[in-house]
Amino acid sequence: MRLVLIIVALVVLSGLVLVQYNQVEGASNEISANVQEANVEAYGTEGFAKADKVIEFEFPADHGPHPDFQTEWWYYTGNLGDADGHRYGYQFTIFRRAILPGEPERTSEWATRQIYFAHFTVTDATGETFEAHERFSRAAAGLAGAQGLPTYHVWLDDWDAREIEPGKVQLQASYGDIGIDLILEQTKPAALQGDRGLSAKSDEVGNASYYYSLTNNT
């Protein structure tokens, strides 16, 4: 049976986090860490923007990509319950990673300096099962990408987060007989981490990220 979790009138604790930064501070799992470490060793971080000062966020534009930065991600997690009392959790993340700064020199539909990778997990807390899947793609030929305007959309193949109306985002991802199809409605203003969204990792200038959360979506 295909598991599809749809928010209708459920109590949901969910959030979106967007982070963009140019320094490698670690990663969410071994595979993504290996990708980042390989990129840094081969190409370094020279030429990319740094999170080195407080900025004024502009939404919805800042929900979209910031290609001057080497890395950013769109991160969703939530807890769900159904009418029978079953409990579920989910996580859906799309990462963008630049290999080199700037635009590719050659003109081709396939040319890119950006790669995207996505993680998708579902936990059946009641049934004590866990599913985890991932995908990788280049940001070319429509295979993967992100935009903030005119409407927010980030995707990798048919896994995506898409604004369907102001303040509402639909998440869709599936693998085999496991999938999510969720509609999240923003209920609170963005929570800015650190100093008005500038989250320092150390005392070194530029060793920081721009980081905000949209919490308590329903």
Go through each PLM region and give its residues.
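Targeting-peptide/extracellular-domain and disordered-appendage signature
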Residues: 1-218
